[in-house]
A protein has these predicted regions:
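Metal-dependent phosphoester/phosphodiester hydrolase catalytic core
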Residues: 1-133
Length: 133
């Protein structure tokens, strides 16, 4: 390995298997297994991980327009929560895990690596879609 990072950060789009997240997640892990073994990593989901080309979470509402332009999620809550759980299970617990609409879980935390404190924040879940409110 040419690079020897102290920390890995994956900010989304780890997975493009829009209807079979677990398959894509295992595939992602297999690609990076050698570097995951001995260093901390931060991994958070983004639009493609939850089956969207773009996602404006609109605080968890159900998307109804083509392309989800009204905001929200087109896949079931169970799927959205599964994706987040699979990708963030290894990070410290969220200090205030109050879910958004439809009981979609939220995720934010902090992690300290090498004396540096990192805030891990998600934002896509709270954005409004381009069709507006």
């Amino acid at each position: 390995m040419e690079q020897d990072p102290d920390l890995l950060f994956f900010g989304g789009d780890q997975n493009y298997h829009h209807t079979e997240h677990t398959v894509g997640w295992i595939e992602f892990g297999m690609h990076f297994r050698d570097i995951f073994r001995d260093r901390p990593n931060i991994c958070i989901p983004d639009d493609h991980d939850v089956g969207h080309g773009n996602v404006w979470g609109e605080s968890g509402k159900n998307a109804t327009l083509p392309g989800s332009a009204d905001g929200g999620y087109k896949f079931p809550v169970k799927y959205v929560n599964q994706v987040q759980r699979q990708q963030s299970w290894h990070l410290p617990d969220c200090p205030h895990p109050t879910p958004v609409n439809r009981d979609i879980s939220v995720y934010f935390t902090r992690i300290t690596v090498g004396g540096v404190d990192f805030a891990v924040l998600e934002d896509r879940k709270f954005k409004s879609g381009p069709a507006g409110k």
